[in-house]
Amino acid sequence: MIRISLDLMGGDFGPQVVIPGAAKALDRHPDISFVLYGLKEQCDPVLAKFPKLREKSIFHDCELAVAMDEKPSQALRRGRYISTMWRSIAAVKTGDADVAVSAGNTGALMAMAKFCLRTMANIERPAIAAIWPTLKGESIVLDVGATIGADAQQLMDFALMGGAMARALFEVERPTVGLLNVGVEEMKGQEEVKEAGRLLREANIDSLEYSGFVEGNDLGKGTVDVVVTEGFSGNIALKTAEGTAKQIGEYLRAAMSRTLLARIGYLFAKSAFDMLREKLDPSKVNGGVFLGLNGIVIKSHGGANAEGIAAAIEVGYDMAKNGLNQKIENDLKKYHAKRLPPMGPEAA
C-alpha cells in the first residue's frame, strides 16, 4: 500500500479539483491510501461525492491554507505546523505517508519542504525535476526553478539525482544524461557547465551514461533520458515549452474553424488532431518532483484539472513504489565515497 498525503487546498481550484483528481488516481491504483489535509467546511461536501475515496482516506481538518500569491517567508511563518501544506509534508517526515502532493504555491512548498524534511547528506541545494514529453516518449529535465545559478558540483549532484529518477520512472538500467548548453562543443558555455561536464566525464558513474552537452532543440527530441541545467534556464525552457504548446493549440483551433471546408476537413482528420491534442495536453505530464530532500514531495501545476492532479499523484506513486530516495541516496553515497581521500594504511 502506497500512502499519499494530499494538500486539498492547493492550486487555483482547491478541493473542487484536487478531490476528484485523487478519486481518479485511486480508480487506477487501488493500492493507494490517502492522508488528506484540508479545511473541513470546504472539503466535506466534495468528499461526500466520492465514497470510495472517503473510505480509503484519513481526513485532517487544518487551521489555514497557504495562498497562491503568498511569499514563501510569510507562508512559512504563518503556516508552519498548522497549514494544509505543512502538515501534508510533515506526514512524510513522521512516516505517516510515503509521498506528499500539493498544487499550492511553488515557493512556499519548497520553503516548507526544505525546512521540514531537510536536504539529504551531500546535497547543498534541492532541484525540481519535470517530466518532459519528447518525440521518443518522455525525458526528465532538472532543475526547473529551485536553484538559480548552480555551480559545477551542484549540477553534478543534479545529474546523479536525475539519473536515479529516470531509473525509478522509466525503469532503464543506465539512463543517458546531458548538460544543457549553448552548443555541443566542449569549449562552449559557462565555466560552471564546462566544469560539470569534466566532473561527469571523469566520474565514470555506473548508474548513468554521460552523453555530453545538449542544446535547447534536443529537449523535445528526446536525445537523452535526463537533461541537467540550473533553475533559471530550466524554468525559462519549461515556460517556453508550455507557451508553445498553447500557441500551437490556438493556431489549430483557429485554422480548423475558419471556413466550412476547414471544419469538414477537421471531421475527417479528427483522430489525428485528437492524438496531437493529447500530446500537447500539459495535464498528461503534470507533477514536478522535489529532489534532494529526505522525503518525496510532488508539485502539481496550480491550474491543473482533475486529470492533471491524478497524473501528479501517479508520479508520486511511481516514485515511492520504485524507491526513488533510496536510489538517490545510494548513488550519492557511491559517488562521494570515490571523492574521499584514502584513509589509514592505504593512504601511506
UniProtKB/Swiss-Prot annotation:
Pfam families, A to Z: FA_synthesis
- GO biological-process terms attached to the record: fatty acid biosynthetic process; phospholipid biosynthetic process
Q: Where does the source fall among the domains of life?
A: Bacteria
Please give the catalytic activity noted in the UniProt record.
Answer: a fatty acyl-[ACP] + phosphate = an acyl phosphate + holo-[ACP]
- Compartments where found: Cytoplasm
Query: What does the record give as EC number?
Result: 2.3.1.274
Query: Any stretches that span the bilayer, and where are they?
Result: none
Q: Cite the InterPro entries for this sequence.
A: FA_synthesis (IPR003664), Phospholipid_synth_PlsX-like (IPR012281)
The pathway to which it is assigned is: Lipid metabolism; phospholipid metabolism
Could you list this entry's UniProt keywords, alphabetically sorted.
Answer: Cytoplasm, Lipid biosynthesis, Lipid metabolism, Phospholipid biosynthesis, Phospholipid metabolism, Transferase
Tell me a Gene Ontology molecular-function term this record carries.
phosphate:acyl-[acyl carrier protein] acyltransferase activity
The record's section on SUPFAM superfamilies has: Isocitrate/Isopropylmalate dehydrogenase-like
**GO cellular component labels:** cytoplasm
So what family is this one in?
Belongs to the PlsX family.
- What NCBIfam families does the record point to? plsX (TIGR00182)
Function comment: Catalyzes the reversible formation of acyl-phosphate (acyl-PO(4)) from acyl-[acyl-carrier-protein] (acyl-ACP). This enzyme utilizes acyl-ACP as fatty acyl donor, but not acyl-CoA.
Q: How does it assemble?
A: Homodimer. Probably interacts with PlsY.
What is the protein's given name?
A: Phosphate acyltransferase
This protein's species is: Rhizobium johnstonii (strain DSM 114642 / LMG 32736 / 3841)
Q: Which gene is the coding source of this polypeptide chain?
A: plsX
